[in-house]
Amino acid sequence: MPGEELMGNRRKVIVVEGTPRTSKKQFARLLARELNYHFVGEPVPDSGILKSFYRGGDRYTLATELYFLVSRFKQLGQAMEQDLFSPSDTVLSFMIEKSRIYASMTLSDEEQKIYDSIYPMLSTTGVKPDLIVYLYAEPSIILRAVRNSPITGEEFMTREYLDSLIEAYHSFFYRYTACPVVFFDVSEIPGWNGENQDVAKDMIRFIDRLKPGSNFYVPRLAAP
């Protein structure tokens, strides 16, 4: 496959993560197709859960965060189980650690203690990324996407919440040392929807030249 030929330093597990409305799933699926990798998408949440979460109902916060944690744990567990019988290189559109990012922003101190007592049992999935591609965008662009095409529950997302979430994501990935992290500001791509094949091919070339730690990707695309 063309993508495989480009990526000489083969990485078995690639994770595409990021802030809301950055087309993580679409770009992860495209990278998987270009590399001839297996694709594992994040589980689709229940719309009622999302609505309760973004409305800010405190009584649902802990239950919501545990729901997401368990859902992601199950999805990764199923992916690992399949890989035991037919090992394959994989691109995932999420990582279990994102659960803790969200929880740290929304839970009270007492709820955080309960969450922290459960998290270690559900965060050891055996999935160890060889590379993380972190997608992010300007808050105004994310909120515009929410207004133009709202997903149930997201209409209750505030600018203050989004600013804090992006800051938490940035902080987490700047400090991440288990594998290289590629920072990609998708605001740089007009009309970004995660399905730009030229960007995917250019990203694969960039991945081939990564250094340890944080790497900052700026697409180098041919003029139309």
Which ranges hold each PLM region?
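Hydrophobic positions on the alpha1 helix immediately C-terminal to the Walker A/P-loop
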Residues: 27, 31
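Conserved substrate/cofactor phosphate-moiety recognition/catalytic segment
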Residues: 33-71
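NTP-dependent small-molecule kinase module
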Residues: 147-156, 160-224
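Glycine-rich phosphate-binding loop used to anchor ATP phosphates in small-molecule kinases
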Residues: 60, 64-127
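P-loop (Walker A) phosphate-binding loop of NTP-binding proteins
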Residues: 19
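Conserved glycine(s) of the Walker
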Residues: 23
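A glycine- and Lys/Arg-enriched "phosphate-lid" helix/loop adjacent to the NTP-binding pocket
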Residues: 99-167
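Hydrophobic anchor at the beta1->P-loop junction of P-loop NTPases
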Residues: 16
